[in-house]
């Protein structure tokens, strides 16, 4: 009215997040048997993070990025944390280089080939593929690689800096008394693998959660300026898996469900572990696609350097048809997502119709 102009802006509705109810399948007896001689572990649980308020002014569209779409600013120095910036080298890969170089020197001196004679390579006539991709990593190989990264964190640690919340001597996971001698020796890779594998089997997590857990672990080590050592590695790994499962799982996750997998841990203690872990990483639970990919490929490099290889299969006609089917499914997902958001164009339809299959 008069000389006053008003304008109402109707922002786009933010996409709804579907929450599916579910429960963790407890498998307590397997947890207690996890590490044959090593201490038994616990299971992860996560915390609810209240969404921050989003304010906007007239003329500005409301666009809220999903947590996995948040990219770090470009002005971050390259020497920053690898869990935040994809151009920074991962800590575990740097720590593993000392052992890798020593193995290569030893093999060169003894004239031992580091290549496996049974390893198969692709050619013009035959193509060998493994079942591990960045979007769907091979579970067993990913767990072996992630636990190997944790092993190098422990073995090549600078000191024994730790915090009370992660100290297993102050917060034991079992009721059995543990001798002080146990904490004087670094755990072997196989013990770490059994511990993590048992947790993933009990919680029914996929390989992606292992990679995200490792990202959280390196973020904790960098932010809190601590080391992973024999006294704290189990509770640190537990906290990371717990957080990853609650942040990224489509299923409803409750701390009470995880407590059923332990002999000597209460809901209050689990809540405190989760709370302190979040606080120490500055509540930075976001993982960008570029950081995730960097960790995935560095884990593959780590596995290759240590003689760990995923099983490979010959690309035959049946497997090619399966790959085509998966490709079609992804195309349809993009198609329906675009149609739902009202951004579908005639060009999108043409590209979808012209999608080619794998030919022989």
UniProtKB/Swiss-Prot annotation:
CDD domains hit by this protein: CYCLIN_CCNY_like (cd20540)
Pfam families documented for this protein: Cyclin
GO molecular function: protein kinase binding
UniProt keyword annotations, A-Z: Cyclin
Keyword Transcription regulation applies: no
Ranges of residues in domain Cyclin N-terminal: 204-286
InterPro entries (alphabetical): Cyclin-like_dom, Cyclin-like_sf, Cyclin_PHO80-like, Cyclin_Y
Domain of life of the source: Eukaryota
Protein family per UniProt: Belongs to the cyclin family. Cyclin Y subfamily.
Protein name per UniProt: Cyclin-Y-like protein 2
Organism (species): Macaca fascicularis (Crab-eating macaque)
Gene symbol of the encoding locus: CCNYL2
């Amino acid at each position: 009215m008069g000389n006053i102009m008003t304008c109402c802006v109707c922002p786009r509705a933010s996409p709804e997040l579907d929450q599916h109810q579910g429960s963790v399948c407890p498998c307590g007896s397997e947890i207690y048997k996890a590490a044959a001689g090593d201490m038994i572990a616990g299971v992860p649980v996560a915390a609810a993070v209240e969404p921050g308020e989003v304010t906007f002014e007239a003329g500005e569209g409301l666009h809220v990025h999903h947590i996995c779409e948040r990219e770090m600013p470009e002005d971050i120095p390259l020497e920053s944390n690898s869990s935040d910036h994809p151009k920074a080298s991962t800590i575990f890969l740097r720590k593993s280089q000392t052992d890798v170089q020593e193995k290569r020197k030893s093999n060169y001196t003894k004239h031992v080939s580091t290549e496996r004679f049974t390893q198969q390579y692709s050619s013009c006539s035959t193509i060998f593929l493994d079942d591990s991709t960045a979007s769907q990593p091979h579970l067993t190989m990913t767990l072996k690689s992630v636990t190997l990264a944790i092993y190098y964190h422990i073995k090549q640690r600078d000191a024994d800096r730790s915090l009370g919340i992660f100290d297993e001597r102050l917060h034991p996971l079992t009721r059995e008394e543990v001798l002080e001698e146990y904490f004087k020796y670094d755990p072997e890779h196989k013990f770490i693998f059994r511990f993590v594998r048992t947790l993933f089997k009990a919680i029914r997590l996929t390989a992606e959660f292992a990679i995200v857990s490792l990202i959280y672990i390196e973020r904790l080590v960098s932010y809190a300026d601590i080391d992973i050592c024999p006294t704290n590695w189990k509770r640190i790994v537990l906290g990371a898996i717990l957080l990853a499962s609650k942040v990224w799982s489509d299923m409803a996750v409750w701390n009470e469900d995880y407590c059923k997998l332990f002999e000597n841990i209460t809901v209050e203690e689990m809540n405190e572990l989760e709370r302190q872990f979040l606080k120490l990483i500055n509540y930075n639970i976001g993982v960008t696609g570029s950081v995730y990919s960097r960790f995935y490929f560095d884990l593959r490099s780590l596995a290759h350097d240590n003689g760990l290889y995923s099983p490979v299969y010959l690309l035959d006609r049946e497997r090619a048809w399966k790959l085509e089917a998966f490709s079609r499914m992804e195309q349809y997902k993009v198609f329906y997502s675009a149609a739902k958001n009202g951004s579908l164009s005639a060009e999108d339809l043409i590209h979808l119709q012209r999608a080619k299959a794998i030919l022989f």
